[in-house]
Amino acid sequence: MVGSIKMKKVSELWGKFLRIPLFKVKFGVVRMDNMPFILFHLSPIFIFFVPFKWELVGLAVGLYFVRMFFITGIYHRYFSHRGYEVRNRFIQFVMGLLGTTCVQQGPLWWAEHHRHHHRYSETDNDIHSPVQYGFWHSHMWWFVTMYDNPKYHRYELKDFAKYPELKWLDNYHVIGPVLLGVALFGIGGAPYLVWGLSVSTVLLWHGTWTINSLSHVFGKKRYETGDESRNNPFLAILTLGEGWHNNHHAYQGGAKAGFYWYEYDITYYLLWCFHKLGIVTKMGQPPERVLALGRANDAARRAARQLVGRRVLGKLTVEEVQLLVHAAEKGASAFRKKKVGEIKAILASLREKAPMSTMPAMA
């Protein structure tokens, strides 16, 4: 009895210690329990204390892209969106274990928060919307301060949470990074540990987070999805295809984000290979209606480019681009000489007179 009381007091003291505030950010407070995240961010400084070899840079870059696939192909397209199916639960568990090596929590945690983002995208309930909270919060501070947001609530996964092995893996997600660290140290000592785990992981974190932040700010919108998701070819390189983010928000339930042959999607190519090997058994594809709408919107954008400058075109919504082309077909002209505000006012007037039907948001 006395022992249990002491343990309870120790637990309470430990809880209070973890809640000690360290510093404030715009929408919350970073506390002591976030210290591992901060220290891990600082750990790449050890590159100055180990011998340098170019093979170490190759190791960091190689593990960045290998584990980026674990995030994009496993955590995102499988656990978050069920874009494909696998042969059995053992493969599913191994996939989850590989995903934990990315040091981004367990598969259930990751999928839960990502589904929450899609459900409330760009609203004040969206935990990492740059529209609502700005760049840095959407990029990295959201997951250390989200529990300070009174509007945040957990999104229950009723599909994958039924598997006890995945719940176990989610609770003990540190196993993956520990196994990776031990393997790296065993192969190449401290230099491999620093470059292969510390440097590579911090780069991987920020590469992953660009989709939350930059892909909702920079790029082109092919679809009207009710949010600010964009297609960004540069980010598609860094994230093995995830940069086609507006495509993804238009149709989430597939294995590919690059909808057309010219939109490189390394994640999809690798999943296709695993499909041929029999590991992946079924791959979801975007329906023809979505692809047809994308082609139509691209054609409208090309036509609109002849009417207004590139800068103006980038500030118009998908619906406004369609209205612009429609107005030009009806005889309206001289849009190129007008400013963005003037064009938007004209298009708003046209919308009131003759509303155009557009694709409903599928985000």
PLM feature segments, named:
Residues 1-210, 214, 254-363:
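Non-catalytic, topology-defining segments of multipass membrane proteins
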